[in-house]
């Protein structure tokens, strides 16, 4: 079905080697970067000179899924590659 195809398009690898091979991986600088490697991640990120956004759904082993959507604006936030990973890392620490 269509939902299976969409999930396949949005699934992101947290494997460092795969991320290095794809400089536009939608993990580094976004929510997925803040997750532990064992997490399963589906996301859609966006970045422009005036904005950095991400919508991510992830699941850690033996935990309920988490959905986080972050919109930011302004050139300083758009260049900030640590804000979104820090938010995901903090939130994933409260999951479970």
What name fits each language-model region?
Residues 1-96:
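Penicillin-recognizing serine hydrolase domain
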């Amino acid at each position: 079905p269509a939902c299976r195809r969409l999930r396949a398009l949005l699934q992101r690898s947290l494997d460092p080697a795969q991320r290095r091979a794809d400089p536009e991986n939608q993990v580094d600088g976004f929510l997925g970067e803040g997750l532990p490697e064992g997490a399963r991640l589906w996301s859609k990120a966006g970045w422009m000179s005036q904005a950095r956004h991400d919508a991510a759904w992830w699941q850690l082993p033996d935990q309920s899924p988490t959905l986080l959507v972050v919109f930011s604006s302004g050139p300083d936030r758009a260049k900030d590659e640590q804000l979104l990973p820090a938010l995901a890392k903090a939130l994933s620490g409260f999951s479970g």
